[in-house]
Amino acid sequence: MGYTENLIDFIGKSTDCYHAVKTAKDRLDENGFTELFEGDKWDVQSGGKYYVIRNSSSIIAFEMPKKDFGAFMICASHTDSPSFKLKPDFEINADGCIKLSVEGYGGMIMSSWLDRPLSISGRIVTAKDGKVETKLVNIDRDLLVIPSLAIHMSRDINKGYEFNIRRDMCPIASDKNGRIEDIIAENVGVYKEEILGFDLSLYNRMRGTVLGTDGEYFSAPRIDDLQCMYSTLEGFLNSESDDNVTVFAAFDNEEVGSGTKQGAKSSFLRDVLERICNNSETYKRAVAKSFMLSCDNAHAVHPNFADKSDGTNRVYMNGGIVIKYNANQRYTTDAVSEAVVKYVCKNAGVPYQMYANRSDIPGGSTLGNLSNEKVSLNTADIGLAQLAMHSSYETAGSRDTEYMVKMIKEFYKTEIVL
């Protein structure tokens, strides 16, 4: 299969942040990486390949060079996507149906969740003999739907509508009480009374597909940011460096500000890098010579809403690596890091394009500037161009994933003197 087909498969397995980490973990295991645990003593060896997971939803992998290293070459993306999360007491008996009480996670296009097959995935937690155990859940079948209100009862719906999650976005699940809890418990082989906690989300069941007259586009759920997560992981697994530690990182909770123990604003990255170095002096010297790519997708020019993009800094699907710029440093790219990215792209034979928001339409921030609060190093914000960001079904360019993989491979082997 090609990169796009493999990406679609990766997305299909990564129904939430926990399954995204599990999918990455499986790829790392296949490639001979060893899992380390934060509560254990580490014995990191030259030439070794390792990964660390925090909260089951963030992951950092690294490969040591066979000799003393000079710096860290880091690529970071995120594992989470906007969705609806189940509330602790989620079943509502309403007029012959059981519907589920949900809360919005991240900023989503709510209408894109209507009238399509949905299901539930995430994790549940049990405890036995004082030991907490986490199990992943994926109800791998069409289970739920959030039905629209018929136009006969909402005549002005096409003139614009403000959705209310509590009223409009509760999925219907059954005509019997308690069945969803039973199905979740059966999925992981426990009694529902054993479930002491859960983090469960809805996900769109529609599989990704290639489209366009020549297959130049593809659509899928969670392209933001699994396209970058997949591309950076594949680039990492197919790269090597003689002089630097190569690092792959994927953080949770980017969509809600990253301010969690497993988010980009946490100590996770710093903790891992410090333990690789063993002492403060080595760590500080290495970080001073290091470089990070913060990888998160960007808004392509929308052909139906072209005026929403900047007049000159416009990016297009299949146009290659997007270098993201913001005067207020919501993106970390500056003249130095921009030059590094362009240099790497040219060496990789990969096209690049410059992105800035329209000056009167502010965009969102991403990982780089937040991660820099804990690990201050030269960073550029990059991504790939896509449409319908934060829809439950997004669209991107079929050629761009390969561009990103090639660029990341080149980045990891590049010696950057700053």
Protein language model regions, located:
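N-terminal hydrophobic/helix-forming segments and targeting peptides
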Residues: 1-418
